[in-house]
Amino acid sequence: DVDKCETCPDMAWKINAVGSANVASACQRNGIRLIAISTDYVFSGDSERPYTEFDTPTGGINVYGQSKWAGEQAVRTHCPNHIIVRISWLYGPGGPSFVHTMLKLADGSRNVLKVVNDQHGNPTSTFAVVRALRELLIRPELVGTFHLTCEGEATWYDFARRIFELAGKSQKVVPCSSAEYVTPARRPANSRLEKKMLALYNLPPMPHWEREFEEFMVKNENIQLC
C-alpha cells in the first residue's frame, strides 16, 4: 500500500528494508536462492525513456520506493544468489487493483470519472509475471535484476478507457493531471520498464499489455462483481 507507507514510514522500512535483509540473510545461511519482488517506484520517474535493469535507481520519490530500494540493496549484500524482479501497474483476479477500482466506480453513482493522464507505465497481469518467474526459476544459473512488465505503455486514463470498453461499460472518463488528484504519496510520472535482461539471456519476451488484458477480461468476465 503505497499511501500507507507514506503515513506509516517506520513500518514501511521495517517490512521492506529490514525484513528483506533478514530474509536474505536466512537464505544465504541455508543455501537458498532468493527471489525478491520489487517495484518501478525505486526510480524517480523523471527519465524521458523507459528504465532498464542497468539504470541506477535514486531511491524513488516516496517512502515505498525508498524502502524497497533499501530492500533491494540488502538482498544484494546478504544473498549473492538472488534474483530481484521489478514489476509495475499490476492487476489480477484477486485484487485490489486499478482494474477492480475502476469497475467498482463504474457501478456507482458517478456520472464522470477523472483519471490521471500524465503518469505512464506498463499495465501488467499477475499471470504474465508468474509465467516469466517460472522461466527464471528453471534457470538456476541466473542471478541479478530483471524487469517483468508487459510490453507497450499507457497512462492510467488510457488503461481506464480500455477497462470500460472491454467490460461493456458506458462510463464517461475524462483525463486529469496528477496535480488534480492528490494522494499521500507522490507517484512517478514515468513507470515504464524495459526488459533488457530477458533479451540478454534469451528468455521469452513479455506479452503486450493490451493483448494480455483482453485475455484477462475474457477469462475473468465476472471480475466487476468482486
Regions found by a protein language model. Name each.
Residues 132-133, 139-185, 189, 217, ...:
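Mid/C-terminal beta-alpha module of Rossmann-like enzyme folds, strongest
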Residues 54, 59-83:
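Active-site Tyr-X1-5-Lys
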Residues 154, 189-226:
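C-terminal amphipathic/interface module of NAD(P)-dependent oxidoreductases
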Residues 1-15:
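NAD(P)H-binding glycine-rich loop region in Rossmannoid oxidoreductase-like domains
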Residues 18-61:
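Conserved Rossmann-fold NAD(P)-dependent oxidoreductase catalytic core, especially the SDR/UDP-sugar
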Residues 73-121, 127-134:
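NAD(P)-dependent short-chain dehydrogenase/reductase
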Residues 11, 19-22, 33, 65, ...:
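Conserved cofactor-binding/catalytic machinery of classical short-chain dehydrogenase/reductase
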Residues 26-30, 78, 109, 167:
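Helix C-cap/helix->beta junction micro-motif
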